[in-house]
UniProtKB/Swiss-Prot annotation:
Consists of two subunits, CofG and CofH. Pathway: Cofactor biosynthesis; coenzyme F0 biosynthesis. This is 7,8-didemethyl-8-hydroxy-5-deazariboflavin synthase. Binds 1 [4Fe-4S] cluster. The cluster is coordinated with 3 cysteines and an exchangeable S-adenosyl-L-methionine. Pfam families: Radical_SAM. The keyword Iron-sulfur applies. Keywords: 4Fe-4S, Iron, Iron-sulfur, Lyase, Metal-binding, S-adenosyl-L-methionine. The keyword Lyase applies. SMART domains: Elp3 (SM00729). The gene is cofG. Catalyzes the radical-mediated synthesis of 7,8-didemethyl-8-hydroxy-5-deazariboflavin from 5-amino-5-(4-hydroxybenzyl)-6-(D-ribitylimino)-5,6-dihydrouracil. CDD domains: Radical_SAM. SUPFAM superfamilies: Radical SAM enzymes. Belongs to the radical SAM superfamily. CofG family.
Length: 368
């Protein structure tokens, strides 16, 4: 049984036979995608406060050091992103900052907000005003928290990471796989197009990798809301010196993801963290969000590739490369979007023209 599922009343039955079948998949068993896509974004770390202290993560700052982005910085970053042709405002923060972060909560109160999710809603409003579509990844969320911001997001996300307990999540506030799965379920119940994924190399074994992918598949089969699954290797940084998975591991687990998931769910590898050129024959069809404006605030030591580098990956694979929105096309076509997001895409302005050009033709009118 997946740890924590009882506490959240999540019934997921994954048979040993299904796991064994998936474990038998190798790269030569899957087909390469016929095209690759990517999304142009700006990365906005709303706060670096987090109740977790994962040993592989450099994103969080301890109490007394964590900060909040102010409204002016959010607006200016979004404006720069729109000028650079970005379509996505990627908002992140550490999972719901706990009571240790007194300065963060005091600042939120001074700005007129009772919670970080209230501030996230205002940040999403700013992004829409500046011509970007919000995609929020605020970690674990309750139904109430997600419902408070879902209508102002084109899509949302949280990494499942793994279905097992690992030492890298250790400590008094360890991540709970059941709680992560509950967030995926809440997104499905609320009809939110959703991004999730697994972390490779944090202490899980092959059984857990297969189980994690099959758990994601089961959630998608119930609600149809998973738009992409990220296969992300853990990478070395100032807090993690435990090594990264080798190429053979990444090729095998990527192929397993492609085999486990239905065709409409994209398989993505982050091109600043994974050897994308060596994984195109393993079933990936997306290269994730990259930014011409901001750094990867979760992995700041690993620079985003330039568009020319993504083009080179596609050319090496002999497939076309196209740009996409932060919500995948079929969710737009099938009526998953909220009224504010639909209005932004249909707007008679530069942002609306940019969104529709990408949606209709995969081409951004703003060149880099």
């Amino acid at each position: 049984m997946i740890p924590g599922t009882d506490a959240y009343d999540i019934a997921i039955e994954i048979s040993d036979a299904d796991i064994e079948r998936l474990l038998s998949v190798m790269p030569e068993d899957v087909e390469a995608a016929s095209a690759l896509s990517y999304c142009r974004n700006v990365f906005l770390p709303l706060t670096t406060a987090c109740r977790y202290t994962c040993t592989y993560c450099t994103y969080y700052d301890p109490p007394g050091q964590a900060e909040l982005m102010d409204r002016e910085e959010i607006r200016e970053t979004c404006r720069r992103g729109a000028d650079a042709g970005c379509t996505e405002a990627l908002f992140t923060f550490g999972d719901d900052p706990d009571d240790r972060y007194t300065a963060v909560h005091d600042q939120l109160a001074e700005w007129g907000h009772d919670s970080i999710h209230e501030y996230l809603r205002e940040a999403c409003e700013i992004a829409l005003e500046e011509g970007l579509l919000p995609h929020a990844n605020p970690g674990d969320q309750t139904r109430e928290q997600m419902a408070h911001v879902a209508d102002l997001n084109a899509s949302m996300g949280v990494m499942l990471e793994t279905t097992t307990e690992v030492q890298a999540h250790g400590g008094p506030r360890a991540k709970n796989p059941g709680q992560r799965l509950n967030t995926l379920r809440v997104a499905g119940e609320l009809g939110v197009p959703f991004t999730t994924g697994i972390l490779v190399g944090i202490g899980e074994d092959w059984h857990h990798r297969a189980e994690s992918l099959l758990a994601i598949r089961e959630m998608h089969e119930r609600y149809g809301h998973i738009q992409e699954v990220i296969i992300q290797p853990v990478v070395e940084n100032e807090r993690w010196q435990g090594g990264s998975p080798d190429l053979a591991t990444m090729r095998r687990v990527t192929a397993m993801a492609r085999a486990a998931l239905p065709e409409e769910v994209s398989v993505q590898v982050p091109p600043n963290l994974a050897p994308a050129r060596d994984l195109t024959d393993c079933g990936i069809d997306d290269l994730g969000g990259v930014s011409p404006v901001t750094v990867d605030h979760i992995n700041p030591e690993y620079e985003w590739p330039a568009l020319q580098e993504l083009t080179a990956v596609a050319e090496a694979a002999e497939v076309p490369l196209s740009e996409r929105l932060p919500v995948y096309d079929h969710f737009v076509d099938d009526g998953w979007l909220s009224a504010p997001i639909e209005a932004a895409i249909e707007a008679d302005n530069d942002a609306g023209d940019r969104f529709r050009s990408i949606l209709d033709r995969g081409v951004n009118p703003v060149t880099l």
